[in-house]
Structure formats: structure tokens, C-alpha cells
A protein has these predicted regions:
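N-terminal intrinsically disordered/low-complexity leader segments
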Residues: 1-16, 197-207
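Helix-turn-helix
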Residues: 2, 20, 24-62, 66
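Hydrophobic alpha-helical connector segments
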Residues: 66, 80-108, 158-161
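Short, basic, alpha-helical segments at the C-terminal edge of helix-turn-helix-like DNA-binding modules
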Residues: 69-76
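Amphipathic alpha-helical packing segments from all-alpha helical-bundle domains
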Residues: 76, 91-95, 124-148, 159, ...
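Amphipathic alpha-helical segments used for helix-helix packing
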Residues: 105-126
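Hydrophobic alpha-helical segments that form the core
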Residues: 153-172, 184-191
Length: 207
């Protein structure tokens, strides 16, 4: 007698509710804004229930926090990789702006997530808090890189580079010719650095 066999469905990797919610939030928040997108849209896109969202994050505000913190960690990891791949302080700083240039020119760029979230948030909201933390880190990064490159007033140069980054991100989002901002940002960083670092220091810092 032939034995009956039962076909089993192939195993598929299960994506956690947290990851599905973060993926949905990432897509919707970045495209439309953290304030405009409601919980109903998020859970529908993620394919989960409202209860799952609240059990996982507690509130929409905490989902916003997780969404931004996730991108904060990714940005830190990318920058760490860039710094490790370049030898001199000048090369490291300009490589960071080279990555910014590529980011702004990308077809998927819709502005800085942190600037957008902060603009929609009230003081104390998760979006504002994480945006402040990210921007403090970014300013510190530019200041440290300027100091290592030999800038006479590293704090001031760090602030100038920070404002350059902000301005380029806004211009790339608002202007129709997004590539113009992308092309200008690295050359502007070079000009700032050259003006801030005395020629004698450039040679020593490049070693």
C-alpha cells in the first residue's frame, strides 16, 4: 500500500512585527512626514494590528523615535566606515562630504529626515529629541575633523561645515536642479577648509 505523503509549504523567513512596522514607518514618514501619517496608515502598510504597534512601541511617538534612531545608527556606521577608509584628516573630512554629495544627488533623496521630523515636532517630542541628538553628533563630528585637519578655529569651522550641510540638504530638497546642490557641497567644503587651515599646517596634517 502506498504511503500518503503530505506536502509541506516551504519555510519562509518571518519578519517580526517590529521590523515590519519600522519598514512601513520608514517609507511613509520619509515620503509624507511624521505628523501627516497616522497609525491606521502605518499598520495597514505593515500588515499588523494597532494592538501590535502599541504592544511593540507603546505609542506613535515612540515609533517615530525608533525610526529616527535607526537611521542615526546607520549614519554613524557609514561615517565610521568612511573615516576608516581614508588616511589623512583632510581626506576623511572631504570623504564625508563626498558621501553627502552622493546622497543629495540620489533619486530617492527627499530631504534630511531629522530636519523634517524636527520641523513637524513640538519641543520634547521624540522627533525633536532625536533630531537634536543627531545634530549635536554631526556638529561634533565636523568640529573634530576640522581640528584634526589643522583648522585654527575648529569650533567655528565645524559650525560653518554644519551650516553648509544643512543648506545643501534643504537646497537639494527644494530646488528642481537637485544636482546643483550636490555638486556644490564638496567644493564649498574644500574652500572652507583651505581658508581655515594655514598652508604650513596642511602639510603636517596630511602626514
Amino acid at each position: 500500500m502506498a504511503l500518503k505523503t503530505t506536502e509541506r509549504a516551504p519555510k519562509t523567513s518571518r519578519v517580526s512585527a517590529r521590523d515590519r512596522l519600522l519598514a512601513a514607518a520608514d517609507e511613509l514618514f520619509y515620503a509624507e512626514g511624521v505628523h501627516v501619517v497616522g497609525v491606521d496608515r502605518i499598520v495597514e502598510r505593515a500588515g499588523v494590528t494597532k494592538a501590535s504597534l502599541y504592544n511593540t512601541f507603546g505609542s506613535k511617538d515612540e515609533l517615530v523615535r525608533a525610526y529616527l534612531e535607526n537611521h542615526f545608527r546607520r549614519r554613524q556606521a557609514r561615517v565610521a566606515h568612511i573615516l576608516a577608509a581614508n588616511k589623512t584628516p583632510r581626506e576623511r573630512l572631504l570623504a564625508v562630504f563626498g558621501e553627502v554629495e552622493d546622497l543629495l544627488a540620489g533619486s530617492a533623496f527627499r530631504g534630511c529626515r531629522f530636519i523634517s521630523a524636527a520641523a513637524e515636532s513640538q519641543p520634547g517630542d521624540a522627533g525633536a529629541v532625536v533630531a537634536d541628538e543627531y545634530r549635536a553628533w554631526l556638529w561634533s563630528l565636523f568640529t573634530d575633523l576640522a581640528k584634526e585637519a589643522g583648522a585654527t578655529d575648529a569650533k567655528q569651522v565645524g559650525r560653518q561645515l554644519f551650516l553648509l550641510y544643512d543648506g545643501a540638504a534643504v537646497a537639494a530638497r527644494m530646488d528642481q536642479d537637485r544636482g546643483a546642490a550636490a555638486k556644490a557641497v564638496k567644493s564649498a567644503a574644500i574652500a572652507l577648509l583651505d581658508a581655515a587651515v594655514p598652508p604650513k599646517r596642511r602639510g603636517r596634517r596630511a602626514q
